[in-house]
Regions:
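Beta1/beta-strand and adjacent pyrophosphate-binding region of the FAD-binding site
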Residues: 1-15
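FAD/FMN-dependent oxidoreductases across multiple families
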Residues: 119-122, 138, 217-298, 302-306, ...
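Conserved FAD-binding catalytic core of PHBH/FMO-like flavoproteins
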Residues: 151-227, 231
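C-terminal helical "tail/cap" subdomain of flavin- and related membrane-associated enzymes
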Residues: 296-387
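Conserved Rossmann-like nucleotide-cofactor binding loop
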Residues: 15, 38, 151
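N-terminal FAD cofactor-binding segment of flavoenzymes
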Residues: 36-73
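Glycine-rich FAD pyrophosphate-binding loop
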Residues: 8, 12, 21-44
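Conserved N-terminal helical subregion
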Residues: 2-3, 54, 67, 72-157, ...
């Protein structure tokens, strides 16, 4: 038997859960599909920036595992500078808990039905709606939000986002002794300059550390070199006793400028749409925002009698892509001038303050570029793709 909904959302990450919540609050009967049983582990550093809380309109401090304001900035696994934070920068979560919390908010609307442990096999979309097939059931809806990640079946079924830049990264969850955990209780670390185009991080969680390395470029470093850097970075940051709980590799997807993320009434959001901030590697904020925009576009289209084309893609291009494109320009500055990217914040509290405001969402890259005058306008000439 085929069941019909106002909307189907595939994926229970931030984009999907937030879209489902917004649709539910608007009174739309929504089906939320997830291929795994919840709660489920999710590959992600788990740093949720302050601007995510702003986008959600809630204080995340009570539900966060840790709230971080201080950053240790490292240069080539040698020199370091501690950047004390006057304001919180990042909330630390395990994604299994954060995503489950967002799903609970969606279910609390009373309009969202969750079916987890149900993998999508195929999707069809036309001007009248969408059909989603799983191994067990077939579902129909007026609209579909594909928020099923970088390798999800929705984009593949629709022929969307098959050509995009994929930035490689690897992370480990590390168990350490109580003394080491205490050292990291209020701070995170970033390493730059050690390997061309790459960076490392340490994010403290409630009972372990998340340690990883990533790369800004799709072709600058072979996988072996990134893996070797990861080993050196781990040994440098955690020289004492430790136990590796989990090691996993992943990629950060970047939407090519102008690439379609919509087919009829089927939309892509979050990582599925390649909405990731290249300079910081942040995806959660953009997932939340795209989920909100997707839901609002659907509600508005319905309110207008479902006439004309759904304008989700135009809204993403107007609201999110300018900042994401500017972030790629800043990432290219790091590729070419890594030393300056360490020295400027390390030596100038004012510059570090500007960076912190970008992370917090109080400023964006365009604002900072304008404040730099003629020097900032040089960024207009930088590439907007990372390949």
């Amino acid at each position: 038997m085929t069941v019909r909904y106002d909307a189907i959302v595939v994926g229970t990450g931030p984009a999907g859960a937030v879209a489902a919540e917004a649709l539910g609050r608007a009174g739309r009967r929504t089906l939320l599909l997830e291929r795994e049983r919840l709660p489920r582990a999710k590959t992600c550093g788990g740093g949720v920036t302050w601007k995510v809380a702003q986008a959600l309109g809630v204080d995340l401090t009570p539900v966060a595992e840790r709230t971080i304001g201080t950053v240790e900035l490292h240069w080539r696994l040698k020199a370091s500078k501690t950047m004390p934070g006057r304001e919180p920068l990042v909330h630390m979560f395990q994604r299994s808990r954060f995503d489950a919390w967002l799903v609970e908010r969606a279910l609390a609307t009373g309009q969202v039905e969750l079916k987890d442990g149900l993998a999508v096999k195929s999707v069809e979309a036309d001007a009248r709606g969408v059909t989603v097939r799983t191994a067990q059931d077939t579902f129909e809806a007026d609209y579909l939000v594909g928020a099923d990640g970088v390798a999800g079946p929705v984009a593949r079924s629709l022929g969307l986002m098959q050509e995009r830049d994929l930035l490689p990264a690897t992370e480990q969850d590390i168990a350490v002794d109580a003394k080491t955990m205490d050292r990291w209780h209020d701070r995170m670390a970033l390493d730059i300059g050690t390997l061309y185009g790459s960076y490392g991080w340490v994010f403290p969680k409630e009972d372990h550390l998340n340690v990883g390395v990533g790369c800004f470029s799709t072709n600058s470093r072979p996988a072996k070199q990134l893996k070797d850097y990861g080993k050196r970075h781990l040994a440098y940051q955690l020289p004492g006793p430790m136990r590796v709980l989990r090691t996993v590799g992943f990629v950060l997807p970047l939407r090519p400028v102008g690439a379609p993320i919509q087919r009829g009434r089927a939309l892509l959001a979050g990582d599925a749409a390649g909405l990731v901030e290249a300079f910081t590697g942040e995806g959660i904020h953009w997932a939340v925002r795209s989920g909100q925009i997707a839901a609002q576009a659907i509600v508005d289209h319905q309110m207008q009698g479902a006439r004309g084309e759904l304008d989700y893609e135009r809204r993403i291009d107007a609201a999110l892509m300018p900042t994401l494109v500017d972030a790629r320009r800043w990432a290219h500055i790091y590729l070419w001038l890594p030393r300056a990217c360490y020295a400027l914040p390390a030596r100038s509290p004012r510059f570090w303050g500007a960076v912190a405001k970008i992370v917090r969402g109080e400023r964006d890259y365009t604002d900072v570029r304008q404040r730099l005058g003629a020097f900032g306008r040089l960024a207009d000439w930088l590439p907007v793709e990372m390949g």
